[in-house]
Amino acid sequence: MFTLKKTLLLLFFLGTISISLCKQARDADEDDGRKMTEEEVKRSIITMTREAKLPQLWKQIACRLYNTC
């Protein structure tokens, strides 16, 4: 009976450790997915400003070409 208790306690302990390690690894993976690097942030800002200014730029060019301003 003593060996059975000892074995069950060992299995419980090892199971708890493995679950804890899996949770830590999963949390680390989720953190990597959410955080953007500084370079990615710069790229996204440049892209957003480019997309926002491009239609306005085309309107200004068309306005000057056709003198409709």
UniProtKB/Swiss-Prot annotation:
Disulfide bonds: 63-69
Tissue occurrence: Expressed by the skin glands.
Residue ranges of coiled coil: none
Localization: Secreted
GO cellular component terms, A-Z: extracellular region
Transmembrane segments: none
Key words of the record: Amphibian defense peptide, Antibiotic, Antimicrobial, Cleavage on pair of basic residues, Cytolysis, Disulfide bond, Hemolysis, Secreted, Signal
Propeptide stretch(es), residue numbers: 23-43
Matches recorded under Pfam families: FSAP_sig_propep (PF03032)
Domain of life, source organism: Eukaryota
Signal peptide coordinates: 1-22
Membership in a protein family: Belongs to the frog skin active peptide (FSAP) family. Pleurain subfamily.
Function noted in UniProt: Antimicrobial peptide. Has activity against Gram-positive and -negative bacteria, and fungi. Has little hemolytic activity on red blood cells.
Name of the protein: Pleurain-A3
Species per Swiss-Prot/TrEMBL record: Nidirana pleuraden (Yunnan pond frog)
